[in-house]
Amino acid sequence: VYAEANNAEDVKRLVSENKVAAIMFECVQGEGGVNPLTKEFVSELAEIAKKEDILLITDEVQTGNGRTGTLYAYMQYGIMPDIVTTAKGLGGGLPIGVAMLGEKAENVFSPGMHGSTFGGNPIASSGALSILKRIDDKLLDEVNQKSEFIKNELSGAKGIKSVTGLGLM
């Protein structure tokens, strides 16, 4: 089921009406623009997941790996998801995806339970390691500085109604 973005009451209603295993969300909605979720809403998602004992999963496929000014966008929201997924920025153009499991979900998979034809590709894995080695405080500061510059320049431009985003998204 899908809930309306930034509407915690809609999420609560859907959780109460359905058998829900997880709440999965993107901190920045990338369809129809670049629209960050509010910090209040994401905090409420975390509270609902904790209260209902369901998994909280953040999809960082577009937002992860420094694109938002932190390693992952959720880090700007003061929450800790049970599962984090990431892909695009991790591979630097190479096909790779990762799901990182926290304590609540760490025992879901054991060696041999999940396989992939392309899993463990040595070139993509080397590329991902190279990307991760390059993401440091200096790079993240640069992302934030460029983000502020772009937002300030666009905000004053003629014909611009609003500027949304997070970091360089």
Where are these regions (language model features)?
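Conserved N-terminal phosphate-binding loop of PLP-dependent enzymes in the Aspartate aminotransferase
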Residues: 1-169
